[in-house]
Amino acid sequence: MRENDILFFNLHRRYLNKSSNYGGFLGIFSLAAFLNQNGFFAQSFAGQLMEGKKLIDEACSQRKVSMIGLYCDYENVTENIFLCQYIKREYHLPVIIGGPQATALNEDFINKSGCDVIVRYEGELTVLSLMNYFLNGIGSLEKIKGIMFKKNGKIHIQPEQNIIENLDMLPFIDDECYLQSNLNNNELSIMTGRGCPFHCTFCHEGHHTRKVRFRSVKNVLSEIELFLNNRKYARNIYILFTDDTFTLIPQRVKDICEGLKKLRKEKDFNWFCEGHIHTLYLHPEMIDYIAEAGAQRIQLGIEAGTQEVLDAYKKGSTIDEIKFVIKKCRDAGIQQIYSNIILGGAYFSKEIYIKNLAFAKELLSLGKGTVEIGVVAYWPLPETDITNNPQKYSIKILDKEFLTANGDFAQTETNELTRWDISFFMQDMEKELQKYMQKMLKNNEIPTKRVLTWFPQEATLKSIGRWWYCLSKMPHLLAYYNILLLGEAKTLKDISLNEILSVHPMRVVSLYLYIEKISSTTIKLFDCILTGIEKDVLVYSTGKMSIENIIKQLSIIYNKYSYDELKNIVLNTLKKLEKEHLVVFSKY
C-alpha cells in the first residue's frame, strides 16, 4: 500500500449475503483521479464493510494516509456512522462524507458520526478545497462552497459549489485510483454526461435537475480505447454507460455508436446503456444505432403499468410508447431489455397491482424472450417530491431512514394496505412473472435461436439474464436447448421428410429422476402424460436406434398394428415428446 493524502471508501454490510454492484459507483474513483491530477495522492475502494475496515486499519496504523472520505447512500448511513466514529476514535484523522445521501444528512448525523464535513452535490472542486484546508492549512471552511459542517455548536450550510461545465477536463480513472489493483477487472463503467433534464417525482437526480453537461464523443471513446488497450489479452470485456441521459441527443448517440462499432472491430466487447422511453419513441433510429453497435442490454425507465401512475411519476411517457419501444428494441436485436415496476408508490392499491401485473405480462409477451421485469418497492429517496409530499400520492412513508429495509421490504403503506400487504404483492408478482416466463418457454413462444443466445458462452455474469435463470430451473428445457446449442442433435422441423426415419430420437433427461406414476398403465414426465405404446417410444428414445428401427422393434410387441399405423403412432408420439422438450434427434 502506497502513502496517500486521502483514501475514499464506499462500504456496505453484506446484507442478505449479497454484494452491492459497485461497478457503477464512479464517484469516489473520479474524485481520486481528479485529486491525483491536481497534485495530491488519492486512492479509492468499494466493497464490504469488514474488508474495508481492515484496509483502513492497515493504512492508518502504518501512517500511510492523512485523511478519509466516505461515500454515503440510502443503504449505508449506519455503516458510515460506525466507520466515522471508529476512525476519529482510533486514528484522529479528518473524515469527510459525500454521496447521494449527503443532502439528506443533518445535525444528528454529524453529532453521532463525528465527521468533520459533509460534501453536498458534485464533489471534485469542493474536495480539492477541503484537501488544501485540512492538509495545507489554506483557507477556511466558511469560504468553501458545497459543504455542511458544525462549528461552535452551530450548523453551517454553505452555498452550492459551482458545477464543472467542461467534463472533458476530468481525467480518466486509471489503476492508480484503486487501492486494490483493478487490472484484472474487465468491466468499465463510464459516465458520458452529468445532470438530468427530467423531473421524475421518485428520483433523487430528477429533483435537483442540475444543468445537463456532456463529455465530447471523442473524449468518451478515448477512455474506452485506453481501457481496451490496457486489456489486449482479456476476454469478456463489458462496458456500462451509467448515465440516464445517454439517449437524450440522437446525433450524439449515433456518433458514439459509430465509434463503438470501430472499436469492436479491433477488440470485441459487450455493452449496456440506459434508455429514456419518450426520447426513444420520438427518435427510434437511436435504437437501431445502439443495436447495430452491439449493445447486449438496455435498461428502460418504465416503472409503472398504468397511465395514471406514469403521469404521477412525471415520466413523460405513455403506455403505447412503452410498447412501441419494447417491440423496436426486440426487432433491432437487443438481447436483454430490462425495466422495473415499482410497487407501493404513487396511488398504489390492489387494482393498480393487478394492472401492473397484467402489463408486465404483456411486455414479456411482446419481448419474446428479451424483456426482463424487476419488481421493486418504492424507495423514499431524499428530497424527491413523493418523499417530501407522500400525501399527494395517497401513501404513507414508514421508514425514510432505511432502517428496516434495503429494497427487500416495503417502506410505505396506504389506507387500505399495510407494508406487509405490499410486500406480499411483491412476492406474488415475482412468482407470477416467473410462472409466465416458464409458460412461454413450455409453449414454444420464444424462438429457438433466441433461447440459444442466453447460454453463457464464457464465464461472465454480465451475459446472463433473467430468462437464463428461468430456463435453468427447468431441467428438461435446459438440456434440450443445450444439446441443440452444441450441435449434437436437431429438431424435427430441421429434418427433411426423406430422412425422418433415419434419425435417432434421444431423451434429454434421466427417466428415474423425473417420472411420476399416474396409474399402472400411465406415467407423467414433467407435463407430458404417456400411456401404452407412448411409454415404449420414450423408452427406446436413447439415440441408439433410428425411428425406422424403433418401429420395427415395436412391431414385434404390437403386431396388431400395420406398419403404417405403427409409423403414425411413433411419429405422433415423438412430435408430442418434442413439443414438451423431452427428445431431440441425432443424425447418427
Predicted regions and their residues:
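Residue-level recognition of beta-strand->loop/alpha-helix junctions
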Residues: 10, 44-48, 71, 207, ...
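Radical SAM enzyme core and accessory elements
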Residues: 2-9, 17, 37, 41, ...
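Catalytic cores of alpha/beta
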Residues: 106-112, 286, 347-362
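Radical SAM [4Fe-4S] cluster-binding motif and immediate context
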Residues: 23, 168-336, 343-345, 358
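Glycine- and acidic-residue-enriched helix-capping/strand-helix junction motifs
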Residues: 15-28
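Glycine-rich beta-alpha loop elements in corrinoid/cobalamin-binding modules
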Residues: 34-35, 41-161, 383
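Short helix-capping segments at alpha-helix termini
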Residues: 38-40, 88-93, 137-139, 261-269, ...
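Flexible glycine/acidic-rich beta-alpha junction loops that bind and position SAM and/or redox cofactors
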Residues: 15-18, 198, 238, 308, ...
